[in-house]
Amino acid sequence: IWDDHETANDAYRDGADNHTEGTEGLWVNRKKYAMRAWTEWLPVRKPNPADSMQIFRKISYGNLANIYLLDTRLFDRDQQNFSATNDTAHHLLGLAQRAWFYNELLNSTAQWNIVGQQVMIAKLSGGIVLNAVPTFQNLKADMWDGYNSERQSLIDHVLNNNIKNVVIITGDIHTSWANDVPTNTYSAGNPATGSAMVEFVTTSVTSPGLDAWLGSTINSQLATLIYPNNPHIKYVNLDEKGYNILDINKIRTQNDFYFVNTITAPNDSSQAKEYWFVNDNERALRKA
């Protein structure tokens, strides 16, 4: 699935933060040609040949897992606006994709529901130090934090219908995270009663981390504020580069975080340094 840098930074349905209409051409053309290049370059089967913009789809692995691939970037995302986060008309998925996704979850007969999508769904607070800082708000506005009404709708759908074993797989922010996705009753002391699902965020292979967006000062502040202000965030690594391996079986789904010592040596090896899992029929992470 694509994210924003196949077109322009912080892209949405009708534009992008890094696109100036007119002087950089028409957004509709830029998006069309970028998606054409993506489709021609990557071996991806389009779920709807009549609609080149639709990439959301389901991949089934027997009765073990359904993998839902979403488009939280280009298909029907409204422009980022943090002040509209609780507006029910402010969409990340859009109505058509959301209806499809909710129906698939509701009717799933697979043991695990793995959701691959672009931006972090778990809440992120910088506490009183950072929450009012515009640069930090802009970061959150591009995540599900900027579309809280839609996030709450998904959480309600999962819990009200007792949909189990939902695991979110995320990229975008070039850093590593292991998160419970909390409800309003989340408690750090008893996360099992307040988590709706879990999330693993993979870092980038070589691209810079959050310091490239936030600046080194805010990034350093964030590093010290994440755990005290976000008890549902179980692990975060803002510095190292690497990849994740997701291991799914009937007992549990586990994410192994692999990192390299340096990104400048082609023959450098990788090491698994952190392991988190969720058990079958549980909604909160455990450390392996």
What role is predicted for each listed range?
Residues I1-A288:
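Metal-dependent phosphoester/phosphodiester hydrolase catalytic core
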